[in-house]
Amino acid sequence: MNNIFKGLITALITPFKDNKLDLYALERILKHQIKHDVDAILIAGSTGEGSSLSFEEYKLLLQTSVEIVNKRIPIISGCSSNNTAYAIELAAESTKIKVDGFMASPPSYVKPTQHGIYKHFEALHEACNLPIILYSAPTRSGVDFSDETILRLSALTRILALKDCGVDLGRPLRIRAIVKKDFNILTGNDEVVLAFNAQGGVGWTAVASNIAPDMCKELLEKWYKNDTKGALEIHQKLLPLYKALFLESNPIPIKYAAHYLGLCENEIRPPLTEASDSAKKQIENIITALSIKI
């Protein structure tokens, strides 16, 4: 099975207008990603406010994205839920709509044991035939995969990768030492992309690439060509942007940044609120300093 979980994957924002999906803005956003040749797009993840979507909105978002992208780049859907049955519904709908794979985190809030986490993903694996990437974000979910659980899950045929949002740079080395060779590990933390990939990672699920896909793509390309100096120069330029995009809870800052650049409305769903004036000013200054344009 081809492993689509590698390279630059943009964790895409979801545009809203008047509390509805803004499909015109969605098309602008997707075409911007396609133009800059990202390796895949993640729809309805945490950056995409997936937990705020109704099931009907989720279906519409995926279906519209699939139609606009038209197989030019892989689409990965977010299927995280603390209700295993509902996560299976999301995965089943993703299969029906024909996305290319899906991502899911351990169930949040309910704090399952490692056995419970394994059974959750085993049920998802049995219920669909799509490739799966595990999503490790313990600051959001409250629980995480142990290394042993990752090893057990990697033995399931279609569980092909791990997205790790942590800062434990020893983890990719530990996981790489125990899993099968074709199991991919990607960072979901923009600030550690180079260090993580130096330790065995093979890609980056990025927030910054919503607005700077060209720079993010160039960074990875230089890294893959062993141009460490060139990659580090771009990384250092982008570091203020990475930090600005996490001044407040993701996706509050990136939604404002996209709005400032004309990609979408600055509309975010409760309980999240729009960026503070202070955060807005810092984001604007960094966008100007980096000469980011759409």
Swiss-Prot record:
Keywords: Amino-acid biosynthesis, Cytoplasm, Diaminopimelate biosynthesis, Lyase, Lysine biosynthesis, Schiff base. It is an enzyme of class 4 (lyase). InterPro entries: Aldolase_TIM, DapA, DapA-like, Schiff_base-form_aldolases_AS, Schiff_base-form_aldolases_CS. Its EC number is 4.3.3.7. Homotetramer; dimer of dimers. The keyword Amino-acid biosynthesis applies. This is 4-hydroxy-tetrahydrodipicolinate synthase. Belongs to the DapA family.
